[in-house]
């Protein structure tokens, strides 16, 4: 008998951080839908303003608060839910659930945990309890011992024997974990590992060098019925975090006995923790024989369960929520197929490849080797009918400038076999590119296996691609059969044209003449073995006919955001989903093209049609040929859509909204600067970096510092502030590399200015705009800035000038749809620095802060015009809203934390308040590891910028009850100083509660900043923000905990 609680509290995962990303927007949204179907009132706690689930249509009540136990207790006290779901918000939600249980909050208010119970969660997440549980149930685990202190860890490592793997309990993304080859390795890093455990516990485990890592996803109901949904094979061996691994599904190298044995163990693991819902079980398999160990389990929706859901077409999160309510597997219908129940295990007639995406080039000093800690910020998923096709598609989806496994920059680089093997031994990201290069330079399968541990099955497939490509290069013309084979192996028109030394248009023309076009296949979860109809599709050249007939009519294709990276995250998925919903009123059929397995936009019940495939000109033109889309929308998915807009328009594609030529003017720095000059709109002095002589002349006129800005980039890629000639020439070189087709502009950097933005919508004549003000001064990338609505420090006169400028641009460029304009304001004069003719990163925040969906308004603007009489309209603010960045410094081994014009944050949180400080503090506390300092603790405050703000910060922290030290080498007037060595010792001893600093001081304070983030100590990297947060600490007792609509926000 199922349970029907009247009101359920769902805990979200908070802002996106490395290892806890948009997969929890997807899983949380599905859980909320499953509850709504039952007529259950839902309450959501989540501070991630960028997500789809923090829109009003998903939860009946929404609290945008820090996802921590004391804030959730306030919600429980007010809402009195019957049940709580903690399995849909990642490790963050599980930790909160365990805390609420241990502190007696759930018992006090009679709140029942739905799904897997707390004792089962603790058995799974405490390394010690998990080991004991497996041994009790005769399930194989590697030799290991747990430890709760440095001394115990060192002692147990001697017993287990080196090399050892250090695994961290109650932890996210392998943070703090490592492989220690010697006692010296262990001593150097064990304190950090213990610091990263929520319960101060690690497991010292025998390191299984070059063993194969596999994952199984299992569903289990309250009666113990189980269904194994997917087997996922990691191409990277043990020692590389699964989130860092390239993976395939279904498993490719297992024989039936291996598969069935591990399947049985998976069901036994689920039984041993009394799982209700979904979990994944990770295995290590000896490549030399039938020997396997169970490594761990996650008793919640996870990154791999989101991948499994999208790979198989089985809605794991939806089914899991139903099981948590007491349904049995046979009682739940799989809504993807619409025909089968949830006890049917999926069968695949295709191969899925997932590859992580890294952005390590944005971070100084970062360790470039893949290891036990996750550092990737996103992932892509491709679908093909052969491993080669699937892998090559996935490489292009990464959007890193590589056309496939072969034929790109790395493949054609000057690099010897020895160098390629060296990079492989170091486990550099995108290892498959170096594997191909090694084979091209003459390496053998055995040589590559020796340094990588990657199965020879996969290495042989990559070698086959190299051999085929080298054969292509000696052809003068290509015949029909060879071209067909190339497409079946996943080669793009670009790759083929490079090999033949022809144009892509030439290859496409031959394909069209020979009728070599991809076919559309359905993902039905059952490999066609059972009748079902789905809307979930991919394209392949390994087929003869389409699985569906294409209708005629008024149809729209929406280009999604692709794989997430620094600067492109869940906020663009919010824009895509918002556009899907808004566009359905104007079109007969709306389809989306996207390939990100983490997102809501790639869910089975969001779009009328979902094409899970590449985003590039070739693929969009293929789809238009089949579907005859009337329009293509490129403005909602971030930079990837804008990058192909002009080329699509040149190929006769009708773009929805602003024209591709206007987008080109805005994205091309030189063209845009000339336009501003023509319109008489103020901007920082600039010059196009066409020659060193021009640059020298310009710098002599305006003086340092100057800002180097490439075109057609997102998140400030290669954008740098240069303070000397040496820096300037180095930055120009890098910027030219990242955007070689477009000009680099050098502009005067205006110091000590306010940065502000306008998120807006235009119909070409009028503007709906929302003003956002940054807390940090100009020079900190907008994605890393703390933002306030309404504005606080800008004068009305400045804002009016900004509005005039925006209106002038909207009319000149005939902007139709969403846009974002960035300003630097100095001495009440606004200077425009950037215009983005697309949905912006801050648009979910500005929309929810004002209670008006800017994407919905965009569709009105495009088709009907804006419905107000003023030339420029800004909705009034009812209360305060503040958005804060989430950094993942601790996950990025070795990097130096600092802020500048290139974006570093991985996510964002927001909160609402009756005052600016009420909203600010809750927003800041929503980003980990931020917390209220313990009074009587120590704060370090120092820096070489914003010194007045730093001094005032120190005064506030003293008032709050902290002992504040500055550093004698960088003293602050009136503040007690200690030397740098003493400061480092205090941080290492974990006696420091918070660090507030400013400026780029890597040679001086690298150890202080790095150790602080490694030990989970809050670090504020800007003096102005430090001052505002320290002031907010003084009003900590005045925080408000209202539902979002009580603040007048939400959409």
UniProtKB/Swiss-Prot annotation:
Positions with a binding annotation for Mn(2+) 3: 822, 834
Cofactor requirements of the protein: Mg(2+); Mn(2+)
GO molecular function: ATP binding; carbamoyl-phosphate synthase (ammonia) activity; carbamoyl-phosphate synthase (glutamine-hydrolyzing) activity; metal ion binding
Chain residues that bind Mn(2+) 1: 282, 296
Positions of the ATP-grasp domain: 131-325, 673-863
UniProt entry keywords in alphabetical sequence: Amino-acid biosynthesis, Arginine biosynthesis, ATP-binding, Ligase, Magnesium, Manganese, Metal-binding, Nucleotide-binding, Pyrimidine biosynthesis, Repeat
Cofactor detail note: Binds 4 Mg(2+) or Mn(2+) ions per subunit.
Entry-linked InterPro entries: ATP-grasp (IPR011761), ATP_grasp_subdomain_1 (IPR013815), CarbamoylP_synth_lsu (IPR006275), CarbamoylP_synth_lsu_oligo (IPR005480), CarbamoylP_synth_lsu_oligo_sf (IPR036897), CbamoylP_synth_lsu-like_ATP-bd (IPR005479), CbamoylP_synth_lsu_CPSase_dom (IPR005483), MGS-like_dom (IPR011607)
Catalytic activity, as annotated: hydrogencarbonate + L-glutamine + 2 ATP + H2O = carbamoyl phosphate + L-glutamate + 2 ADP + phosphate + 2 H(+)
Residues bound to Mn(2+) 2: 296, 298
Chain ranges of the MGS-like domain: 930-1051
Binding site residues for Mg(2+) 3: 822, 834
Associated pathway: Amino-acid biosynthesis; L-arginine biosynthesis; carbamoyl phosphate from bicarbonate: step 1/1; Pyrimidine metabolism; UMP biosynthesis via de novo pathway; (S)-dihydroorotate from bicarbonate: step 1/3
List of residues binding Mg(2+) 2: 296, 298
Binding positions for Mg(2+) 4 per the UniProt entry: 834, 836
Gene3D superfamilies attached to this UniProt entry: 3.40.50.20, ATP-grasp fold, A domain, ATP-grasp fold, B domain, Carbamoyl-phosphate synthetase, large subunit oligomerisation domain
Residues binding ATP 1: 127, 167, 173-174, 206, 208, 213, 239-241, 282, 296
Subunit structure: Composed of two chains; the small (or glutamine) chain promotes the hydrolysis of glutamine to ammonia, which is used by the large (or ammonia) chain to synthesize carbamoyl phosphate. Tetramer of heterodimers (alpha,beta)4.
Alphabetized PANTHER family for the sequence: CARBAMOYL-PHOSPHATE SYNTHASE [AMMONIA], MITOCHONDRIAL (PTHR11405:SF53), CARBAMOYLTRANSFERASE FAMILY MEMBER (PTHR11405)
Domain comment (free text): The large subunit is composed of 2 ATP-grasp domains that are involved in binding the 2 ATP molecules needed for carbamoyl phosphate synthesis. The N-terminal ATP-grasp domain (referred to as the carboxyphosphate synthetic component) catalyzes the ATP-dependent phosphorylation of hydrogencarbonate to carboxyphosphate and the subsequent nucleophilic attack by ammonia to form a carbamate intermediate.
Role description: Large subunit of the glutamine-dependent carbamoyl phosphate synthetase (CPSase). CPSase catalyzes the formation of carbamoyl phosphate from the ammonia moiety of glutamine, carbonate, and phosphate donated by ATP, constituting the first step of 2 biosynthetic pathways, one leading to arginine and/or urea and the other to pyrimidine nucleotides.
HAMAP family assigned: CPSase_L_chain_A
The protein's name: Carbamoyl phosphate synthase large chain
Record organism: Saccharolobus islandicus (strain M.14.25 / Kamchatka #1) (Sulfolobus islandicus)
Name of the gene: carB
């Amino acid at each position: 008998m199922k349970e029907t609680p009247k009101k359920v509290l769902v805990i979200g995962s908070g802002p996106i951080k490395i290892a806890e990303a948009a997969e929890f927007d997807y899983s949380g949204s599905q859980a909320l839908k499953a509850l709504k179907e039952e007529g259950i009132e839902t309450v959501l706690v989540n501070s991630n303003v960028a997500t789809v689930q923090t829109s009003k249509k998903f939860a009946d009540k929404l609290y945008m608060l820090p996802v921590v136990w004391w804030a959730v207790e306030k919600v429980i006290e007010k809402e009195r839910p019957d049940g709580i779901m903690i399995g849909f918000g990642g490790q963050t939600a599980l930790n909160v659930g365990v805390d609420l249980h241990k502190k007696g909050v759930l018992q006090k208010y009679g709140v029942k945990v739905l799904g897997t119970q707390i004792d089962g969660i603790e058995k799974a997440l405490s390394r010690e309890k998990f080991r004991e549980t497996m041994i009790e149930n005769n399930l194989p685990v590697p030799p290991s011992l747990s430890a709760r202190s440095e001394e115990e860890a060192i002692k147990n490592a001697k017993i287990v024997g080196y090399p050892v793997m250090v695994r961290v309990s109650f932890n996210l993304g392998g943070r703090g974990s490592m492989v220690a080859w010697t006692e010296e390795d262990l001593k150097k890093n064990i304190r950090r590992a213990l610091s990263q455990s929520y319960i101060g516990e690690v497991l010292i485990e025998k390191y299984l060098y070059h063993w194969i890592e596999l994952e199984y996803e299992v569903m289990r109901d309250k009666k113990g019925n189980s269904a194994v949904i997917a087997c996922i094979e990691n191409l990277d061996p043990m020692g590389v975090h699964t989130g860092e691994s390239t993976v395939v599904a279904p498993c490719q190298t297992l024989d039936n006995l291996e598969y069935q044995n591990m399947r049985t163990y998976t069901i036994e693991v689920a039984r041993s923790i009394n799982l209700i819902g979904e979990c994944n079980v990770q295995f290590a398999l000896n490549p030399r024989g039938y020997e396997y160990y169970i490594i761990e389990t996650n008793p919640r929706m996870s990154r791999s369960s989101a991948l499994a859901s999208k790979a198989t077409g089985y809605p794991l999160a939806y089914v899991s929520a139903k099981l948590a309510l007491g349904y049995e597997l046979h009682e739940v219908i799989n809504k993807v197929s619409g025909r089968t129940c949830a006890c049917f295990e999926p069968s695949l007639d295709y191969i899925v490849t997932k590859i992580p995406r890294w952005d390590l080039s944005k971070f100084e000093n970062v360790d470039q080797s893949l290891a036990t800690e996750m550092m990737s910020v996103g992932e892509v998923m491709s679908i093909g009918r052969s491993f080669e096709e699937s892998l090559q598609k996935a490489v292009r989806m990464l959007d890193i400038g590589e056309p496939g496994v072969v034929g790109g920059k790395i493949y054609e680089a000057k690099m010897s076999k020895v160098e390629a093997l060296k990079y492989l031994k170091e486990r550099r990201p995108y290892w498959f590119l170096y594997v191909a290069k090694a084979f091209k330079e003459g390496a053998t399968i055995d040589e590559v296996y020796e340094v990588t541990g990657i199965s020879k099955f996969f290495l042989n497939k990559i070698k086959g691609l190299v051999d085929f490509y080298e054969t292509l290069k000696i052809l003068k013309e290509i015949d029909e059969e060879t071209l067909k084979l190339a497409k079946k192996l996943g080669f793009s028109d670009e790759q083929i044209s490079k090999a033949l030394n022809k144009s892509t248009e030439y290859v496409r023309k031959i394909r069209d003449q020979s009728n070599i076009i991809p076919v559309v296949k359905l993902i039905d979860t059952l490999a066609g073995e059972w009748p079902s109809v789905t809307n979930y599709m991919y394209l392949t050249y390994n087929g003869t006919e389409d699985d569906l007939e294409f209708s005629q009519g008024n149809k729209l294709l929406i280009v999604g955001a692709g794989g997430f990276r620094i600067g492109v995250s869940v906020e663009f998925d919010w824009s895509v989903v918002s556009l899907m919903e808004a566009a359905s009123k104007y079109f007969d059929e709306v389809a989306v093209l996207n390939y990100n397995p983490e997102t809501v936009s790639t869910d089975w019940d969001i779009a009328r049609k979902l094409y899970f495939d590449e985003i590039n000109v070739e693929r969009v033109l293929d789809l238009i040929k089949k579907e005859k889309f009337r329009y293509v929308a490129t403005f909602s998915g971030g930079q990837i859509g804008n990058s192909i807009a002009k080329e699509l328009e040149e190929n006769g594609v009708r773009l929805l909204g602003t024209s591709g030529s206007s987008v080109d003017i805005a994205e091309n720095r030189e063209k845009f600067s000339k336009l501003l000059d023509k319109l008489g709109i103020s901007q920082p002095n600039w010059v196009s970096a066409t020659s060193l002589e021009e640059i020298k002349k310009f710098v002599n006129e305006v003086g340092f510092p100057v800002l180097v800005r490439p075109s057609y980039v997102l998140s400030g890629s290669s954008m740098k502030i240069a303070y000397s000639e040496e820096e300037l020439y180095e930055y120009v070189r890098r910027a030219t590399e990242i955007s070689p087709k477009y000009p680099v502009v050098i502009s005067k950097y205006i110091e000590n200015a306010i940065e502000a933005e306008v998120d807006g919508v235009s119909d070409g004549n009028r503007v709906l705009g929302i003003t956002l003000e940054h807390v940090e001064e100009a020079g900190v990338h907008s994605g890393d800035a703390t933002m306030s609505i309404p504005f606080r420090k800008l004068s009305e006169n400045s804002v009016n000038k900004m509005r005039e400028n925006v209106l002038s641009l909207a009319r000149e460029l005939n902007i139709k749809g969403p846009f974002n304009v960035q300003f630097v304001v100095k001495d009440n004069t606004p200077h425009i620095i950037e215009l983005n003719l697309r949905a912006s990163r801050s648009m979910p925040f500005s929309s929810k802060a004002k209670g008006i969906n800017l994407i919905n308004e965009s569709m009105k603007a495009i088709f009907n015009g804006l419905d107000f009489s003023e030339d420029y309209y800004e909705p009034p603010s009812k209360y305060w809203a503040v958005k804060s960045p989430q950094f993942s410094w601790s996950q990025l081994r070795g990097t130096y934390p600092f802020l500048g014009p290139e974006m570093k944050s991985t996510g964002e949180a927001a909160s609402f308040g009756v005052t600016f400080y009420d909203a600010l503090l809750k927003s800041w506390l929503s980003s980990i590891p931020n917390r209220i300092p313990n009074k009587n603790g120590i704060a370090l405050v120092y820096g070489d910028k914003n010194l007045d703000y730093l001094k005032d910060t120190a005064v506030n922290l003293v008032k709050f009850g902290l002992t504040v030290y500055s550093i004698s080498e960088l003293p602050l007037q009136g503040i007690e100083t200690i030397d740098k060595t003493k400061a480092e010792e205090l941080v290492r001893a974990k006696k420091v509660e918070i660090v507030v600093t400013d400026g780029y001081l890597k040679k001086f304070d690298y150890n202080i900043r790095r150790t602080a983030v490694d030990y989970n100590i809050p670090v504020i990297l800007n003096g102005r923000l430090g001052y505002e947060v320290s002031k907010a600490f003084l009003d900590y007792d005045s925080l408000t905990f209202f539902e979002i609509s009580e603040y007048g926000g939400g959409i």
